[in-house]
Amino acid sequence: MDQETVGNVVLLAIVTLISVIQNGFFAHKVEHESKTQNGRSFQRTGTLAFERVYTANQNCVDAYPTFLVMLWSAGLLCSQVPAAFAGLMYLFVRQKYFVGYLGERRQSTPGYIFGKRIILFLFLMSLAGIFNYYLILFFGSDFENYIKTITTT
């Protein structure tokens, strides 16, 4: 890959790698809680603490593909910097959700709701990028400069 191409995706790649580390952390928590309860083997049933850790991890895993698609779509189609920032915010919120789910479940609700809003923001960025592509294609008008001006301020 040439330097310009790497420069266009490096922030997205960094956020993706951080998300992989976070997934590893969540999986480690599930494994640790399982071994604490069941000795050396992994079981899907156990105490309330294990059920909470396992459910929180599954909820995060279920939303992960959607997050990755929205992150990369928004970054490639619209603008890398705000997409990467939104991705970092999503990872922070997902961490808050995971930790909140381990305590009282109502503590996880703000993280869940804010995470949905971040996914919506990334979706709207992707739509703006697609809309801009068709504006250029049909009308020759490029709104990407306007979008970049708004997102860099």
UniProtKB/Swiss-Prot annotation:
- Which GO terms label this protein's molecular function in UniProt? arachidonate binding; enzyme activator activity; glutathione peroxidase activity; glutathione transferase activity; leukotriene-C4 synthase activity
Name the job this protein performs.
Answer: Required for leukotriene biosynthesis by ALOX5 (5-lipoxygenase). Anchors ALOX5 to the membrane. Binds arachidonic acid, and could play an essential role in the transfer of arachidonic acid to ALOX5. Binds to MK-886, a compound that blocks the biosynthesis of leukotrienes.
Domain comment from the record reads as follows: The C-terminal part after residue 140 is mostly disordered.
Alphabetized, the UniProt keywords read:
Endoplasmic reticulum, Leukotriene biosynthesis, Membrane, Nucleus, Transmembrane, Transmembrane helix
List the GO biological process terms.
leukotriene biosynthetic process
Q: Where in the cell is it found?
A: Nucleus membrane; Endoplasmic reticulum membrane
How does the record describe its quaternary structure?
Homotrimer. Interacts with LTC4S and ALOX5.
Topological domain, Cytoplasmic: which ranges? 31-52, 103-107
The protein's name: Arachidonate 5-lipoxygenase-activating protein
Q: Which residues lie on this side of the membrane: Lumenal?
A: 1-8, 78-80, 129-153
Keyword Transmembrane found: yes
InterPro entries attached to this UniProt entry: 5_LipOase_AP, FLAP/GST2/LTC4S_CS, MAPEG, MAPEG-like_dom_sf, Membr-assoc_MAPEG
GO terms for cellular component: endoplasmic reticulum; endoplasmic reticulum membrane; nuclear envelope; nuclear membrane
- Any intramembrane ranges? 108-115
> Which family does the similarity line name?
Belongs to the MAPEG family.
The record, for Pfam families, names: MAPEG (PF01124)
Q: Which gene encodes it?
A: ALOX5AP
Name the predominant localization: nucleus
Q: Which residues cross the membrane?
A: 9-30, 53-77, 81-102, 116-128
Membrane topology category: Multi-pass membrane protein
State the source organism's domain of life. Eukaryota
